[in-house]
Amino acid sequence: MLTKYALVAVIVLCLTVLGFTLLAGDSLCEFTVKERNIEFRAVLAYEPKK
């Protein structure tokens, strides 16, 4: 039962990050969430347009 809730929590977190990335568009380079002793960081690696 607990693993079911953990799976749902991970899916919701992934969808939230994906949605935020789509909304921010090209202006997003790094996204960091810090809560208590947990840090989640998403970094986009890309080559700038010339």
From Swiss-Prot:
**Cystines in this chain:** none
Q: Where would you find this protein in the cell?
A: Cell inner membrane
Membrane topology annotation: Single-pass membrane protein
Family statement drawn from the similarity comment of this UniProt entry: Belongs to the Hok/Gef family.
Pfam families noted in UniProt: HOK_GEF (PF01848)
Query: Which gene is this protein's source?
Result: hokF
Which InterPro entries does this entry report, sorted A to Z? Answer: Hok/gef_toxin, Hok/gef_toxin_CS
**What is the protein name for this chain?**
Putative protein HokF
* Coiled-coil region(s): none
Q: Where are the transmembrane segments?
A: 5-25
Query: What keywords would UniProt list here?
Result: Cell inner membrane, Cell membrane, Membrane, Toxin-antitoxin system, Transmembrane, Transmembrane helix
UniProt main location, coarse? membrane
Question: What role does it play?
Answer: Toxic component of a type I toxin-antitoxin (TA) system. When overexpressed kills cells within minutes; causes collapse of the transmembrane potential and arrest of respiration. Its toxic effect is probably neutralized by an antisense antitoxin Sok RNA.
GO CC terms in record: plasma membrane
